[in-house]
């Protein structure tokens, strides 16, 4: 029997009515805002958010967004809760610019693109016969059609130096998000920044080891998928850099309101869609899929195992609450049973060390990396959970009378 999580749903007619109402309101608000901005000169493009792209010897796939607001810049060491809250507001109050003509260049080839209604651009650049750089990353460039706002766009090179690829979730897979504790999750999202958010211990060393492969010299690409909105892209990219997690293309979700992507629609199916696209785009590679038990990753990755078979090397589902048996564990274990007949190993794991030990047995990483991962995981086991740490921090501020930096760490 197919495992199903317990979930309450709104009646279909109520959901449809709410969607239509909010979509209509959103369209009117967007239209009014753009008329106001055009009247007072506030709709001019000021920033091209060029997301990390990926490609191979034949070309590259690139995406990004044109905004009428300047970039926020990285987090500062002295940012307090108010700075973080204000920056979060600025991220979600995005002033996208539709209908902007762009010129994108890569390996000497130039193409034109135009932003859509939400300010996004997407382009495929074919570069047959053009030399491919030996580096793991190569830069494309994107600019307005008149040449202004010239912006570099990093392109991950998937070349002969890769044995396999990694597709990983983000929340509670590499980044502590406490997605099951809404109070802590809200505090982390709104009152923290890329510098104060915490990685899962051992994740950075594990992902670097997977990228380097069994011999320690490979260039295996790492991709990230998440149900978080594109508005958080800069925070996630900064977070990876600050915590030495291998950078890679990040595929997020547009929370714009239309029938295809209504903000309140449940589900994480776009993760599977992105995984399918990557697997098809790079047919030479086999894949390692990493997720967590807090969302639907087990179900989605099980579908990938059934669909792609031997092209999936392994599936690892992090237990968001290891040591405690709960319905989520049974849900994940049910999908593991479903996958058992595919010959794809699928495991529910407690931490990065469990992933590393199994991956070592498959010949996916070098044994020398285990000691570093084990040491980081051991430190994490002695640390309080995020809800416990948040409660302790709040108590300390009450005792000391220091409430000027709530949420900071």
Residue positions per predicted region:
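Intrinsically disordered, low-complexity acidic/polar segments
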Residues: 73, 132, 164, 324-326
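Intrinsically disordered, serine/threonine/proline
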Residues: 1-158, 352-409
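Short, well-ordered amphipathic alpha-helices
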Residues: 125, 206-210, 301-304
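Short, low-complexity, polar/charged sequence segments that are solvent-exposed and flexible
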Residues: 82-85, 123, 132-134, 160, ...
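C-terminal cap/substrate-recognition subdomain and adjoining C-terminal extension
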Residues: 2-20, 228-409
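Alpha-helical substrate-recognition element adjacent to the catalytic core
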Residues: 6-43, 47, 53-56, 96, ...
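Short helix-terminating capping/connector loops at secondary-structure junctions
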Residues: 132-135, 160-161, 215-220, 282-284, ...
